[in-house]
């Protein structure tokens, strides 16, 4: 078990390389063109700013300056 205490980092590197290879393999399987052709419509973004921002902050262009 002395070798495990000295070389534990090699096992970690082998594990990370395996994870990286599986990620690359899974990403190659994704067909992004097919997804983009059939992607669902997103609902409109609701941020509820319309409830408190009723006043107009910007001056109108045709209004004379004070």
From Swiss-Prot:
Disulfide bonds, paired cysteine numbers: none
Compartments, record wording: Cell membrane
Transmembrane intervals: 4-24
Amino acid composition bias (Basic and acidic residues), ranges on this chain: 42-51
Membrane topology annotation: Single-pass membrane protein
GO cellular component: plasma membrane
Main localisation: membrane
UniProt keyword annotations, A-Z: Cell membrane, Membrane, Transmembrane, Transmembrane helix
Region described as Disordered: 39-66
Pfam family, one: UPF0370
HAMAP family, per database record: UPF0370
Family indicated by similarity: Belongs to the UPF0370 family.
Protein name (record): UPF0370 protein YpfN
Encoding gene (name): ypfN
């Amino acid at each position: 078990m002395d070798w495990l205490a000295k070389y534990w980092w090699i096992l970690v590197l082998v594990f990370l390389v395996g994870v990286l290879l599986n990620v690359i393999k899974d990403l190659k399987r994704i067909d992004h063109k097919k997804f983009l052709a059939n992607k669902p419509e997103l609902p409109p973004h609701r941020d509820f700013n319309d409830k408190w921002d009723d006043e107009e902050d910007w001056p109108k262009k045709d209004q004379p300056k004070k």
